[in-house]
Amino acid sequence: MSADFRHEPVLANEVLELLRPRPGELFLDGTLGGGGHSGLLLEAGARVIALDKDPRALAAATARLARFGEAFRAVRSDFRDAKNVLEALGIGAVDGALVDLGVSSPQLDEAERGFSFSRPGPLDMRMGDTGETLEDLLRRIDERELARILREYGEEPFARPVARAIKAALEAEAPLDTARLAEVVAGAIPRKAWPHRIHPATRTFQALRIAVNDELGALAAWLDGLPGVLAPGGRAAAISFHSLEDRMVKEKFRALTQACTCPPDLPVCACGAKASFAAITRKAVKASDDEIARNPRARSARLRAVEKLR
């Protein structure tokens, strides 16, 4: 296997502590990547079905985890389709589910994938090899929609001037690559407003990646599908890396653990409903200083988990 797809799974000990894998239990890893988290579950004696859109990641992780034999199965799919994948495999429910919403280092490092602004690459940014590329998206949407994406997904305060500059560059320059796109973005932001410690194009590139891959839509679908995917007693964990994702996970997990469905203006509960989920984490779990020193990527990781009661 190529060493490129080996990676240290973030919050490894915390994931094992929260998911509590036992021999023979079945887990769904919605974001296989380098296979780090799947490997941890398999080492604990669990069986794993793992999903990923990236065929190269699938091939590399499958080779790495081949020693576990039939206990491991990899499927090329978006994690938003987890329930459909399980149904196609004849599986009713799993004992645990996990997603790690970070982008793998190989995807960021390979210029041809179009995620990085440190080296010139095509305007792609797809996690897999199908669907609309970044260039397709930028040419399809207008300046106003682009500004909305930058503002909502990247929390870019200069969304309008950045969007205007990107659209102008697309019209004036051909072809436009990722390195040049980063220069265009940086040039649209006043130098005195450049963020500390990160490239001024970081927020824009994050927003565009989220839009190209519909990452928030995929996360919403995975969260909505949890009641139908988990068996009673099953646990779900999500590792997010920016505030938009963490907010979605936090709000959905809170909704799942609420029992009463009465209107909020009703002074006393009349429905008698019981919660079907319980929170395992009261607040987001963060990486230790030691882990961050070993793996700086873990600095922004946030882990939340719930358990299905019935």
UniProtKB/Swiss-Prot annotation:
The lineage of its organism: Bacteria, Pseudomonadati, Myxococcota, Myxococcia, Myxococcales. This is Ribosomal RNA small subunit methyltransferase H. It is found in: Cytoplasm. Belongs to the methyltransferase superfamily. RsmH family. S-adenosyl-L-methionine binds at G35, G36, H37, D52, F79, D100, Q107. The keyword Ribonucleoprotein does not apply. It comes from Anaeromyxobacter dehalogenans (strain 2CP-C). HAMAP family: 16SrRNA_methyltr_H. GO terms for cellular component: cytoplasm. SUPFAM superfamilies: Putative methyltransferase TM0872, insert domain (SSF81799), S-adenosyl-L-methionine-dependent methyltransferases (SSF53335). Specifically methylates the N4 position of cytidine in position 1402 (C1402) of 16S rRNA. Its EC number is 2.1.1.199. Gene3D superfamilies: Putative methyltransferase TM0872, insert domain, Vaccinia Virus protein VP39. The gene is rsmH. Its main location: cytoplasm. GO terms for biological process: rRNA base methylation. GO terms for molecular function: rRNA (cytosine-N4-)-methyltransferase activity. It catalyses: cytidine(1402) in 16S rRNA + S-adenosyl-L-methionine = N(4)-methylcytidine(1402) in 16S rRNA + S-adenosyl-L-homocysteine + H(+). It comes from the Bacteria.
